[in-house]
Amino acid sequence: MRLSAFIAALLMMFALAPAQAVPKDWNRVVAATPAGGYLIGNPAAPVKVVEYFSLTCPHCRHFVETGLAPLRGNYIAKGKVSLELRNFVLNGPDLSASILMTCGSPALAVHLYDAVYADQEKLFAGAFSLKQDALDRIQAAPLEAKPGVFAHEAGIDAWFAAHGLPPKQAAACLADPKRQQRLIDLRAEAIEKQNVQGTPTFVVNGTAVSGTGWEDLEPAIKTALGGG
């Protein structure tokens, strides 16, 4: 057999071999939701988890550090569970940071969610120790400009710029009163519809979970999947 014929035969064998299906990692699927959140995972997942979070919340950071990896690896990746992230603003630094987190694409928002908790103490260190002259500038700013002035004085805008959010885009979002109001409305809706009182609050298929940790959330997920 000629070499050219041999190579052609080999290529034909590869062409006829059944393709090995690569399992889809649903963690790569991110979309904005009508409720104002960000959905990670299979939109048709049988179990839907909603997390109400605050970017300044240490208990939220603890969940991210201890529970997010198993949630993503064992449940979201396989299409069994989806996770919707919804902001629940608690304070001024949180409002400024939440405006910036939600300023770009859904994928960027999820990236920033992860990044904030990985660097939470450093990010907000200046926000809670502002000097009087900085506080005076914030106080003197018009109401709609306060989140932007606060972000600048506390270095929050610089942190987000270093993590992928273009400064001009950030400035436009901080100055947009509709974005500010939407986050305030999200908080009000969470209180009214789900009786959210603090963060993190988890809701599994419409039912609130008692507790704030992975040790509380995973049993609720297993029960919803039929294995609890």
What residue ranges belong to the model's regions?
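A short hydrophobic/aromatic micro-motif that marks alpha-helical segments and, especially, helix-coil
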Residues: A17, Q120-L123, Q181-R182
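Structural alpha/beta surface segment adjacent to cysteine/selenocysteine redox centers
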Residues: L55, H62-P147, E153
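C-terminal cap of thioredoxin/glutaredoxin-like
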Residues: L3-A5, A21-P23, S54, K146-G228
